[in-house]
Amino acid sequence: MLSQQAFDALGPIFVRHGWVFFGPYRRGQGLSAQAGPYIGDEIDKAKKSGGISAGAATMVRLLATDHLDDQLAGFAWLRNQSFVEPKRIAVAGNSFGGVETVFGVERADYCAAVDSAGGAESWELAPQLQAAMTGAVRSAKAPIFFFQAENDWNLGPTKTLSAVMKDRGKPYIEKIYPPYGKSRQDGHTFGYFGSAVWENDVFEFLDRYCPRARPR
């Protein structure tokens, strides 16, 4: 799916709730096509040369380095914009974006994070990803809302990472919604296109942990 489709679906919803919506293109796609190779192509190359394990290792390495660096650069840029409240920056993502959300909340001072289906498609075959995401939530600096549709590829990420947050005494929400669409891939796109179901829950969470400053 093209990032623009996700931006078109999600942007108006966040704006309606009073948020600035910032959706950067990842390397190799859209407006960032010349910024570096596309992560999907790099994973495919690694799989061809070294199998599933090599592909998983490449995925984790890129998401935890180059792509995380890009996320943190975007966070730093946002904090310096006059139209942004620097202490009210939240991070949210679906699929790879959910993985990035988890990695980002360990490093940046977000007020809250929303992880939809992060790592679901790769979870069972990528113990490296499980370890990296688990390690990140252990050090999470902000509350996280984990959610998935019941028919997503694997519900392990939400259940496992929520359990880690609970064990660490960190604030979180865990939610498994009813099946979305007819296939597992439909379920995996719930974070993009299922806002009619999750909208109230997500923005109640954001309002709780990222309250607007009271006018003086």
Predicted feature locations:
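Short amphipathic alpha-helix adjacent to the substrate-entry channel of hydrolases
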Residues: S3-P24
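Short beta-to-alpha linker loops that shape the active-site pocket of alpha/beta-hydrolase fold enzymes
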Residues: V20, Y25-G30, G118-G119, P178-Y180
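Glycine-rich "HGGG/HGxG" loop immediately N-terminal to the catalytic nucleophile
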Residues: G28-D41, S183
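Alpha/beta-hydrolase active-site loop
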Residues: I39-S82
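Alpha/beta-hydrolase fold nucleophile elbow
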Residues: F83-N94
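Gly/Ala-rich beta-loop-alpha elbow adjacent to hydrolase catalytic centers
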Residues: G93-G97, T101
